[in-house]
Swiss-Prot record:
InterPro entries to which the protein is assigned, alphabetical: UPF0145_dom_sf, UPF0145_YbjQ-like
Gene3D superfamilies attached to this UniProt entry: Hypothetical protein apc22750. Chain B (3.30.110.70)
Gene: ybjQ
Highest taxon of source: Bacteria
Protein name: UPF0145 protein YbjQ
HAMAP family, per the entry: UPF0145 (MF_00338)
Family statement: Belongs to the UPF0145 family.
Pfam families the record matches: YbjQ_1
Record organism: Salmonella dublin (strain CT_02021853)
């Protein structure tokens, strides 16, 4: 399965549009992990623990997107958009959502 944020794939023709596909992943905030991340893990203004969790959530969302596309018979997803949003009481969770168009391609 190929993924692209662009509307086309270099060297390939889109022969069929299969539909819009989506994927989501929600990260819950853990107060103790958050506290220790703030003390131990911030180096140069970045938190490795948070970055690792965000990467994992993005991978889960993209995996869901790919599974939906495959179920539609697609071999690629184009025009992918990745969004991050806080949800829950007091923004206590982070949602990663991805969407795109499932397509069939030909070289």
């Amino acid at each position: 399965m190929q993924f692209s944020t662009t509307p086309t794939l270099e060297g390939q023709s889109i022969v069929e549009y299969c539909g819009v596909v989506t994927g989501e992943a929600i990260l819950g905030a853990n107060i103790f992990r958050d506290f220790f991340a703030g003390i131990r893990d911030i180096v140069g203004g970045r938190s490795g623990a948070y970055e690792k969790e965000l990467r994992k959530a993005r991978e889960i969302a993209l995996q869901e997107l790919g599974e939906q596309a495959k179920a539609l018979g697609a071999d690629a997803v184009v025009g992918i958009d990745i969004d991050y949003e806080t949800v829950g009481k007091d923004g206590s969770m982070l949602m990663v959502s991805v969407s795109g168009t499932a397509v069939k391609t030909r070289r």
